[in-house]
Amino acid sequence: MNSQNTPIHIRLWHHDFWRMAVANLLLTMAVYMLIPTMPIWLTKQQGFSNLEAGIAMGAYGFGLFVLGAFVSYLVQRFRRNLVCIWSAAAMAALVGVSYYSDVQLCRKYEFYWMVLQRFTFGSLFGLAQMVLTSTLIIDTCESYQRTEANHSAAWFGRFALSLGPLTGLLLMRYIGFQAVWLTTVGLIVVAVVLIRLVHFPFRTPEDDVQMIGLDRFFLPHGFPLFINLQLIMLAVGLLLSLPFSEHFYAMMMVGFLLALLAQRFVFVDAEVKSEVVTGLIVINAALLILLTRTQQIVAYAAPIFVGFGLGVIGSRFLLFFIKLSRHCQRGTSQSTFMLGWESGIAWGLGLGIALFNGHSQELLLTALTLTITSLVMYNYTHNWFAKHKNR
């Protein structure tokens, strides 16, 4: 399968798939709302140093991996939709407790408690997202539509990277961080309701289910792709640690829309390698103009370039992971992609806050070095992928 585009089938877009896709959007928005807002709250209101705030934000990325080895056992042992629902509900409860402690009790958080909170939040989101993307979304469609379902649902999560921070910054500007807490809880609750509205028939568990395993968690033979994706997202995480305004994230959304159009019309008959190469070149261009230019046009061009680059890179890497998967490993490929994407953003964000302390030139140079390294690495990774793909 060397086609650049995923075909669109109207029959895929039935009520249940819409509910799952929107649930993915809302759940991911709830997480991304905290990217630009929580570091401000930690440093300005909680009195954390930049190093402490960066460690706390980065702890989320480590939490993502903690429960992954148990995903296969949990969805076999319990009803798969309930595993996602309860993990998402626990996320909402954790944020609700944080809101109560911050707003109602007016308590200052200890550093170690905040690290634990972020780590736990990451572990719960990782579990919910693995079950949602690796099992529930593809269970709502026919087998021949699964690649399209993965592709389409992932775009909802991608748009959350602009919608979430945009919403969070607007709430913080006009109401305060307490509104961010409450909206985060609200988004998760609505996502839970949407998942609950979809009927998933009972599936008889396998006879010999191991409690710990890589099934639905991590694709070992996709490790080179995983590292390449993570390097790219580290650079993006570093970039997002800068104090951008709502305008930046609104323009990122424009970039995502342009990426969708480009996939539909520009990359239709292009070489398979072209999307990722183009995306990385465009992101490099965004970093360069942020480094070297101060004109008003930069505020529009740079975030559009970043959104466009992320859009085409994310879509292509997702399909690469699917093509690497063997029989019954589609769900595992989705989880591996999600972990590379999310952990890269989280660790880049944490490093940017902890180490650069507002020194944007050094941070942008580091991000540029990472993206150039990723581009060089991709020339080898793509050849490796072409030899090892299974679909």
What kind of region is each of these model predictions?
Residues 55-74, 254-263:
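Central cavity-lining transmembrane alpha-helices of secondary-active solute carriers
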Residues 89-108, 281-295:
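C-terminal ends and interior cores of transmembrane alpha-helices
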Residues 4-61, 220-252:
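Helix-loop boundary and gating motifs at the non-cytosolic
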Residues 273-317:
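C-terminal transmembrane helical hairpin of 12-TM major facilitator-type secondary transporters
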Residues 325-360:
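A late C-terminal transmembrane helix in Major Facilitator Superfamily
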